[in-house]
Amino acid sequence: MVQVNENEYRLKFFLNNNYNRKICQVCQTPFWTKDKERNVCADIPCTDYYFFDLNIKSPPLTVREARQKFLKFFEKKGHTIIPPKPVLARWREDLYLTIASIVDFQPFVTSGIVPPPANPLVLSQPCIRLEDVDNVGVTFGRHLTTFEMAAHHAFNYPDKQIYWKDETVELSKEFFVEEIGIPEEELNYKESWWEGGGNAGPSFEVTVGGLELATLVFMQYEIKDGNYVPLKLKIVDTGYGVERIAWFTQKTPTAFHAIYGNLVYTFFNKIGAPLVDDELLKTAAILAGRIDPDKPETIKRHREEVAKKLGLDLKYVDQELTRAARVFQVLDHTKTIALMLADGLVPSNSGEGYLGRLLIRRALRVLRLLGSDIKLYELVKEQIEYWKEDFPQLLKNKDYILDVVNLEQERFNETLSKISLTASSLSRRKEISVDDLVKLYDSNGIPPDLLVEEIRKINPEIKVEVPYNFYGLVAKRHQTVPLKDTKKEKLPKDVIDLAENLPPTKKLYYEDQYKRSFTAKVVSVYKNYLVLDQTTFYPEGGGQIGDTGIIKDEKGNTYQVVDTQKVKDVIFHILDKEPSLKEGDEVYGEIDWQRRYRIMKHHTVTHVILSAARKVLGEHVWQAGAEKTPQKGRLDITHYKLPTEEEIKKIEDLANYIINDRRSVRPLIINRTEAEMKYGVSIYAGGVPEGADVRLIEIKDWDIEGCGGTHLSNTSEIGALKIINVEKIQDGVIRLEYVAGDVVAQYARQEEDKLKEISRQLSTSPEQIEVRLKRFLEEYKEKEELLNQYRKMMLQEIENISKKETVNGVTIYIINLFDEELRKEAMRKLTMNQKSIVVNISNKGNNNVVEIATSNDLRVDKIIEALRREGGKGGGKGTYGSITTQLNVDKIVNTIKSTINNGI
């Protein structure tokens, strides 16, 4: 821990209430307690869990009851209850998951840019942390992938103090003593230090009976160049473990029994795993503080201690606790999976989707280890039913959640079918490092223990070990958003540097999005880059391309604006040539209105389509990218499979309904905190803008999201919409391309021209294409059937009609078949006998294409190499190869014979 002045922790509250500062005899950490005899900090591993033996006044509390008791207590103490945010941190551009309650307020509230939604406030925030995923179950409840962090926060400004350390500690004491009924002498405040996100401060860990029930952090420093600089905004950042409070009051054998109640027994039953004795579990839990997950040997030692204490066989204890831990892992993981999917996660091979897929696959792997063939979605369904009142989004998105989990299980099974092939390719190595295993999992998703098992069947000597915390290592690599590559700037560096010393450009396009022309004064001229004091030219941003148009000077010179770009708040007009202008000159500007108007249509319709897609496909749909040009619009959305034609029609019809319904479209400038509280984090579908205020585009009773682009004032101006292309561009991302307004007519004409050309090729009219095509396909089918009959006849005679020769005990068949399907079947049939080679030679221009197939007991490698030495190009290995050569047929055959004579 950082060396901190003792006065940071020497609070008036402690001194006035007869608390003593002690040094733990085990860990040497200072802590505060009213118990004068206490010499140990009451935290694991300094002690075992002994809260089971403490007498408290509170009745057993479920998770829901513990949550409500906490919220209501702090509401009585003047805190405003605010709703939690989703478990996907979409208001953050650097983080995928909500890992703590303070994340809800980062970066804008904590940096002082915007005020908090209330001050002080209280909430219970569901959180997900995956770096300790391998420890879940093994520690019987100390580690969970999903948990609720109940928290009260106070934001202290220089001119407005709410409360600080003394009040925070006193509130915790009152909650634990008055609401939970813990004897005050059992409370311990362990001195600690917190750092995260560039901030730091002293903290207290509240420990009782071996269990850490809360952490009280006082965020008061900013870390700059390794130094601690006092913050102007000082934040009380607390975290109370809701699940731990429930366990503390229920005193169940493990935390999982307290969190999940009867669902524990349901899971054992459905998985087909025999129940584990409660006394064994409770003893294991009491001693679980001795487990250090970073030291796997402590797990073995823990089980030895449990066996000794109960007088049981170690093998039996190990077997029982392993089974229990695995069932608890499935319990934990399925809840986390349900919460992730309910908040809109789409499993994929990147981003937040990667973390979701990792957890699904880990749950599936654990089920295999338990020998269970139950479908994972059946267990997730149980979680939805159990938690539906606490998290209504689970029930609302139930169909999506179950559909995705089922699909992911199918994909996982497909992945496992490739394990032998992957193992074979890796078995030639002498060693596989942990980093290699992580990279392999990233690329193919095969559980490392299964992969290593297969590799060792082929190469028992290979050096490879799967670390105990493998999945945690993988999760850690993916838990934060990688730093985005520096955007490929469209402006040269000298122009970007120029912007540093220029004033912001007034944005006339926000005052009136229909404004076509304007007058302005020149602020800067550099080469063909022009900066004005104000402009109606929209600079490229948010997927909308920059405006073009003209600029005229007072002398009558006209300059074409070929592009518009922005550096921070300075707008650059890129001209077709260097202008004869100087600072202070007045100019006239006019945008290419037809072009801009088409872009506006494609931009507004993008918002219409996104909302339509969410309504048709589900609330998990999120914008993954977009582009708006005069020619068309493009929207990339998160979705787990390619939409059906019926779904695309529904999206298109719904969007056209909104267009024809003449919905008003208006921009709103609103405080960020107010916007989030009123509309939720979906306002960030197009990205997270900076600043205290956000600009929203509202389509009446349809859609509202943050956007800095130019828009129509009514959906009717869009005219019409046609989706022209739908494709899967990457795992979990679907691309929609569409046209709007008068571009729809252009697109229709192009399609009409294609139809006319097709009808011309079929010698019929456009009206008769369907009839003609049907007849054509029937004729094609008849001819295909006839061709198949000829193929069968040829195959029956292939051995007789091919040139056959025996060389060095090997039978060589020389054939010349142009029909690809017939050729493949012939080569397969002729190589069924041992020691046989088939050579198909076909002419292609000035070259001969040679295909070679061998029976399973021979290889083509040497033959291919011999033909390559003669100038051939191609390759092959095993039983098949192909090469292109200028050799004539006789020379090809002789080269092959010679190679066989020398032995292949």
Swiss-Prot record:
It comes from the Archaea. InterPro entries: aa-tRNA-synth_II/BPL/LPL, Ala-tRNA-lgiase_IIc, Ala-tRNA-ligase_IIc_anticod-bd, Ala-tRNA-synth_IIc_core, Ala-tRNA-synth_IIc_N, Ala-tRNA_lgiase_arc, Ala-tRNA_ligase, Thr/Ala-tRNA-synth_IIc_edit. GO terms for molecular function: alanine-tRNA ligase activity; aminoacyl-tRNA deacylase activity; ATP binding; tRNA binding; zinc ion binding. Its EC number is 6.1.1.7. One of its GO terms (cellular component) is cytoplasm. Zn(2+) binds at residues 603, 607, 707, 711. SUPFAM superfamilies: Class II aaRS and biotin synthetases, Putative anticodon-binding domain of alanyl-tRNA synthetase (AlaRS), ThrRS/AlaRS common domain, Translation proteins. The keyword Cytoplasm applies. Binds 1 zinc ion per subunit. CDD domains: AlaRS_core (cd00673). GO terms for biological process: alanyl-tRNA aminoacylation. Its cofactor is Zn(2+). Gene3D superfamilies: 2.40.30.130, 3.30.54.20, 6.10.250.550, Bira Bifunctional Protein, Domain 2, Threonyl-trna Synthetase, Chain A, domain 2. Keywords: Aminoacyl-tRNA synthetase, ATP-binding, Cytoplasm, Ligase, Metal-binding, Nucleotide-binding, Protein biosynthesis, RNA-binding, tRNA-binding, Zinc. It is found in: Cytoplasm. Catalyzes the attachment of alanine to tRNA(Ala) in a two-step reaction: alanine is first activated by ATP to form Ala-AMP and then transferred to the acceptor end of tRNA(Ala). Also edits incorrectly charged Ser-tRNA(Ala) and Gly-tRNA(Ala) via its editing domain. Consists of three domains; the N-terminal catalytic domain, the editing domain and the C-terminal C-Ala domain. The editing domain removes incorrectly charged amino acids, while the C-Ala domain, along with tRNA(Ala), serves as a bridge to cooperatively bring together the editing and aminoacylation centers thus stimulating deacylation of misacylated tRNAs. Belongs to the class-II aminoacyl-tRNA synthetase family. HAMAP family: Ala_tRNA_synth_A. This is Alanine--tRNA ligase. It comes from Sulfurisphaera tokodaii (strain DSM 16993 / JCM 10545 / NBRC 100140 / 7). The gene is alaS.
